[in-house]
């Protein structure tokens, strides 16, 4: 009897099919941590445990502020600013400068959010944090700061109402008046409706466009031209005001040592005081110089023709280097004994 043979048609290498859950999209998150949290590993580990590490990035705020880190553009759906190690946001708020806000805004996707871990970001409208976020291009929606969508264009119809022929109407040289114009926010003209034709002869011309006025700067608005009503500046201060002592600031008060210079727009009286002192010193010096001047009547003649007549020291003719302190010829050049010396207007003539 022949043995029976059974053939197994099932493949031994058939892979086991497993079902995987796929999400339509993954929200990419960026965590910005202050420097103080780097030394508290436990707190940082607890924060990372609440986020999916496959779609979560961690950056330090101080490195971002110093320009050591570059964020990719239009990448993150959520940027979360972590609190400091002590539970506040004092350190992170100091690092959030205008430059850092600009980098964060570029890294956000359209409609992405910028939040803080404690939920207090952008709550104070008068705060510097809120102002810098608005200047960076973020908007507030539902109490959350997010990046708006600037690509969407909205058509704004501009309806130009027609007026009767009796009223003036501005006419364009390019053609008949336009009834409806739709202009998108992006600045590009979408459509122009120019179906209505109006003859130019039926529209009266007006040299002055509507809404344009002219200002006559010479018009005094019917004010009375009375120059007597001008205030005399000499009457602003009374005699009692002039008697009051001047309030000199402490920095302008006289001090020992180097004399202080007056300010350019001095109002405390220091400039006048210094000018008066300088004038007195100049007058005193001029009076002293005036006493030393010799007039034409003050001519003196010294005759040394008499032989054998010498001074007390005998060195008068040798020069100042050999003359005594009381010599009347100090300042005169050396001369020969017996030579006639004349003093004419303080000039020595030999």
Swiss-Prot record:
<keyword id="KW-0004">4Fe-4S</keyword>
<dbReference type="InterPro" id="IPR046408">
    <property type="entry name" value="CIAPIN1"/>
</dbReference>
<comment type="function">
    <text>Component of the cytosolic iron-sulfur (Fe-S) protein assembly (CIA) machinery required for the maturation of extramitochondrial Fe-S proteins. Part of an electron transfer chain functioning in an early step of cytosolic Fe-S biogenesis, facilitating the de novo assembly of a [4Fe-4S] cluster on the scaffold complex CFD1-NBP35. Electrons are transferred to DRE2 from NADPH via the FAD- and FMN-containing protein TAH18.</text>
</comment>
<keyword id="KW-0411">Iron-sulfur</keyword>
<feature type="short sequence motif" description="Cx2C motif 1">
    <location>
        <begin position="313"/>
        <end position="316"/>
    </location>
</feature>
<feature type="binding site">
    <location>
        <position position="313"/>
    </location>
    <ligand>
        <name>[4Fe-4S] cluster</name>
    </ligand>
</feature>
<dbReference type="InterPro" id="IPR031838">
    <property type="entry name" value="Dre2_N"/>
</dbReference>
<dbReference type="GO" id="GO:0005737">
    <property type="term" value="C:cytoplasm"/>
</dbReference>
<dbReference type="InterPro" id="IPR007785">
    <property type="entry name" value="Anamorsin"/>
</dbReference>
<feature type="region of interest" description="N-terminal SAM-like domain">
    <location>
        <begin position="23"/>
        <end position="156"/>
    </location>
</feature>
<keyword id="KW-0408">Iron</keyword>
<feature type="binding site">
    <location>
        <position position="263"/>
    </location>
    <ligand>
        <name>[2Fe-2S] cluster</name>
    </ligand>
</feature>
<feature type="compositionally biased region" description="Basic and acidic residues">
    <location>
        <begin position="190"/>
        <end position="208"/>
    </location>
</feature>
<feature type="binding site">
    <location>
        <position position="316"/>
    </location>
    <ligand>
        <name>[4Fe-4S] cluster</name>
    </ligand>
</feature>
<feature type="region of interest" description="Fe-S binding site A">
    <location>
        <begin position="252"/>
        <end position="268"/>
    </location>
</feature>
<feature type="region of interest" description="Linker">
    <location>
        <begin position="157"/>
        <end position="242"/>
    </location>
</feature>
<keyword id="KW-0001">2Fe-2S</keyword>
<feature type="binding site">
    <location>
        <position position="268"/>
    </location>
    <ligand>
        <name>[2Fe-2S] cluster</name>
    </ligand>
</feature>
<feature type="short sequence motif" description="Cx2C motif 2">
    <location>
        <begin position="324"/>
        <end position="327"/>
    </location>
</feature>
<feature type="binding site">
    <location>
        <position position="327"/>
    </location>
    <ligand>
        <name>[4Fe-4S] cluster</name>
    </ligand>
</feature>
<dbReference type="Pfam" id="PF05093">
    <property type="entry name" value="CIAPIN1"/>
</dbReference>
<dbReference type="GO" id="GO:0051537">
    <property type="term" value="F:2 iron, 2 sulfur cluster binding"/>
</dbReference>
<dbReference type="GO" id="GO:0016226">
    <property type="term" value="P:iron-sulfur cluster assembly"/>
</dbReference>
<keyword id="KW-0963">Cytoplasm</keyword>
<feature type="binding site">
    <location>
        <position position="266"/>
    </location>
    <ligand>
        <name>[2Fe-2S] cluster</name>
    </ligand>
</feature>
<keyword id="KW-0479">Metal-binding</keyword>
<feature type="region of interest" description="Fe-S binding site B">
    <location>
        <begin position="313"/>
        <end position="327"/>
    </location>
</feature>
<dbReference type="GO" id="GO:0046872">
    <property type="term" value="F:metal ion binding"/>
</dbReference>
<feature type="binding site">
    <location>
        <position position="252"/>
    </location>
    <ligand>
        <name>[2Fe-2S] cluster</name>
    </ligand>
</feature>
<feature type="region of interest" description="Disordered">
    <location>
        <begin position="165"/>
        <end position="209"/>
    </location>
</feature>
<comment type="similarity">
    <text>Belongs to the anamorsin family.</text>
</comment>
<feature type="binding site">
    <location>
        <position position="324"/>
    </location>
    <ligand>
        <name>[4Fe-4S] cluster</name>
    </ligand>
</feature>
<keyword id="KW-0496">Mitochondrion</keyword>
<dbReference type="GO" id="GO:0009055">
    <property type="term" value="F:electron transfer activity"/>
</dbReference>
<dbReference type="GO" id="GO:0051539">
    <property type="term" value="F:4 iron, 4 sulfur cluster binding"/>
</dbReference>
<protein>
    <recommendedName>
        <fullName>Fe-S cluster assembly protein dre2</fullName>
    </recommendedName>
</protein>
<comment type="subunit">
    <text>Monomer. Interacts with TAH18. Interacts with MIA40.</text>
</comment>
<dbReference type="GO" id="GO:0005758">
    <property type="term" value="C:mitochondrial intermembrane space"/>
</dbReference>
<dbReference type="Pfam" id="PF16803">
    <property type="entry name" value="DRE2_N"/>
</dbReference>
């Amino acid at each position: 009897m022949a043995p029976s043979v059974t053939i197994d048609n099932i493949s031994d290498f058939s892979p086991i099919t497993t079902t995987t859950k796929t999400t339509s999209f993954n929200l990419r998150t960026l965590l910005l941590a202050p420097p103080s949290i780097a030394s508290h590993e436990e707190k940082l580990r607890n924060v990372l445990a609440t986020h999916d590490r496959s779609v979560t990035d961690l950056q330090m705020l101080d490195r971002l502020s110093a320009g050591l880190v570059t964020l990719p553009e239009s990448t993150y759906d959520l940027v979360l600013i972590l609190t400091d190690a002590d539970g506040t946001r004092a350190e992170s708020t100091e690092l959030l400068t205008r430059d850092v806000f600009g980098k964060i805004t570029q890294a956000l996707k359209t409609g992405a959010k910028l939040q803080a871990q404690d939920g207090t970001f952008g709550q104070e409208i008068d705060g510097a944090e809120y102002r810098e976020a608005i200047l960076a291009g973020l908007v507030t929606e539902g109490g959350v700061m997010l990046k708006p969508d600037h690509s969407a264009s909205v058509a704004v119809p501009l309806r130009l109402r027609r007026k009767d022929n009796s009223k003036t109407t501005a006419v364009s040289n390019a053609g008949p008046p336009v009834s409806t114009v739709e202009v998108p926010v992006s600045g590009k003209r979408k459509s122009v409706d120019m179906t209505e034709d109006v003859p130019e002869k039926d529209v009266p011309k007006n040299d002055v466009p509507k809404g344009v006025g002219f200002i006559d700067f010479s018009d005094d608005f019917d004010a009375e031209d009375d120059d007597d009503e001008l205030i005399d500046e000499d009457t602003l201060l009374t005699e009692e005001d002039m008697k009051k002592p001047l309030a000199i600031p402490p920095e302008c008060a006289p001090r020992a040592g180097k004399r202080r210079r007056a300010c350019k727009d001095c109002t405390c009286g220091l400039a006048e005081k210094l000018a008066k002192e300088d004038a007195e010193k100049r007058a005193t010096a001029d009076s002293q110089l005036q006493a030393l001047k010799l007039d034409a009547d003050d001519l003196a003649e010294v005759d040394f023709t008499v032989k054998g007549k010498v001074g007390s020291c005998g060195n008068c003719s040798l020069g100042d280097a050999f003359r005594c302190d009381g010599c009347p010829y100090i300042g005169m050049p050396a001369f020969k004994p017996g030579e006639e010396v004349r003093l004419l207007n303080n000039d020595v003539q030999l």
